[in-house]
């Protein structure tokens, strides 16, 4: 049935996230306003809520909310026997089961919205809509060339450090393995460094005791202290043996892939949005204060630009305003705490 979305509100349980992308990008639906019952539940039943009366929930999935707020019961998806199947492969019985499953979900979402809307501030509905549009109707333009250049630089720097370490450790061994396995030298070194067991063996080979710590899961057991946050591992990066220090620093680089991941995510996101980059945020995502929290590549927490150029600068510097607009940058120290103190007083 045709619907005039220009004067309608599209409400879904994950409409401020995945569902809105499907609706807008795959189905071409552009409603007058977006509503999200999951977002509303996060705000209304957060630990610090002051306008509802303080019921805290164990989660905001449709199943949990429907049960805890007594608006109905969600059906069992497993019973539809459709998991892992494409629609084209559904039997008639499976299509009928899925139709019933979806009808119940839709009915639960409608009941949930009617429950949550009571006492819910109208301006917060506007913020949920705004948050959703920052995702599905992005305005920031990405300078993809700048991001791609930074990504190449990061990968080349890692590769160079791994090759240098391979030479220091004995390139002949790795070269022989390369001929046998077809694996590149840098990939072999990467594997040696990424594995705690293999890195421990490397330390032993270099005459350095493997640092140990009490196992976080079993206090009676000791385990290698080789995580990037372990003080003993951090100390290895300034070891008197330069080979040990180099290996420790290279292991840290291998384990730290956040920058590469974010740069790649920027490129992928812009590729599917005609060169523009979505800003995915979770409304009321912070458990204590109820502020927005970062999603995906966390646009709320991009690395600062320091006095010396770094590849991570590309994350901020690649963001461009659309034609006719400017980006105004503002960053205040301790702003979350200060805003909450202000709200507490008023």
Label the model's feature ranges.
Residues 1-2, 336:
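Metal-dependent nuclease catalytic cores that hydrolyze phosphodiester bonds in DNA/RNA
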